[in-house]
């Protein structure tokens, strides 16, 4: 695994991995984080030196809020969130000048820097529900726009980009899970037991 070589370059660093990483990668990481828990977990790590993987945009967002830490970033990223650009922001704000811009920290800095709010999907949804504003441009996976419109019918929500669709997220449906549990379809994924045990450690530490 290439990352083992990278880790050897930073032997005194605590390795923080985003939850959306492979099981194999989790086996050599110290702790997992979600976008909503990343800042607090990094703050609570005793070690000043942090190697944050794999999303450099999420990592930069964390680093900005925890300046007391020495955070090294790798050049990974979410292929869905990085599709959105400053041009998309300009276009959306021109179409909806009264709307607040709420974006996920996995977006490019050129997008995040223009936002009225940056946060996890849960954070975005909570902010929109509690806000007195009536219009919002949403810079994350487009299904969140639909969830918000259903939850807040008195407000208007617009996708920052109609291209912000995560096809990987949509590969597995509730029906697939149901069929798999029944044994009539779907696909059961089985992990090597050694990998499972090692990967579980950094999840438990979270």
Locate each region found by the language model.
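C-terminal functional extensions of proteins
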Residues: 122-123, 131-133, 140-206
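General beta-strand structural signal in soluble alpha/beta enzymes
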Residues: 15-19, 24-27, 31-35, 41, ...
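Short active-site oxyanion
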Residues: 11-14, 47-50, 97-100, 131-136
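Short, small-residue-biased leader/transition segments that mark boundaries at the very start
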Residues: 1-2
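Internal active-site segments that recognize and position negatively charged phosphoryl groups
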Residues: 40-64, 90-97
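Redox- and metal-dependent alpha/beta enzyme cores, enriched for Fe-S-associated oxidoreductases
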Residues: 61-66, 73-117, 121-133, 144-152, ...
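Acidic (Asp/Glu)-rich catalytic clusters
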Residues: 6-10
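Short, well-ordered, mixed-charge alpha-helical segments that flank or form enzyme active sites
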Residues: 22-27, 39-42, 58-61, 79-82, ...
């Amino acid at each position: 695994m290439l990352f083992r070589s990278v880790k050897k370059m930073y032997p005194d660093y605590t390795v923080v991995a985003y939850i959306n990483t492979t099981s194999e990668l989790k086996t050599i990481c110290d702790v997992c984080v979600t976008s909503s828990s990343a800042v607090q977990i990094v703050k609570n790590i005793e070690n000043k030196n942090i190697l944050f993987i794999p999303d450099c945009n999420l990592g930069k967002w964390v680093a900005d809020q925890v300046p007391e830490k020495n955070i090294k970033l790798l050049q990974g990223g979410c292929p869905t969130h990085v599709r959105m650009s400053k041009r998309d922001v300009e276009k959306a704000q021109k179409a909806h000048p009264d709307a607040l811009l709420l974006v996920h920290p996995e977006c490019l800095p050129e997008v995040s820097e223009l936002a009225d709010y940056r946060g996890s999907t849960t954070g975005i949804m909570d902010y929109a529900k509690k806000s007195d504003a009536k219009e919002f441009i949403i810079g994350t996976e487009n299904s969140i726009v639909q969830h918000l419109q259903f939850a807040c019918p008195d407000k208007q929500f617009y996708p920052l980009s109609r291209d912000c669709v995560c096809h990987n997220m949509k590969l597995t449906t509730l029906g697939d899970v149901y069929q798999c549990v029944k044994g009539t379809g779907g696909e059961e994924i089985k992990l090597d037991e050694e990998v499972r045990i090692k990967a579980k450690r950094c999840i438990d530490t979270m």
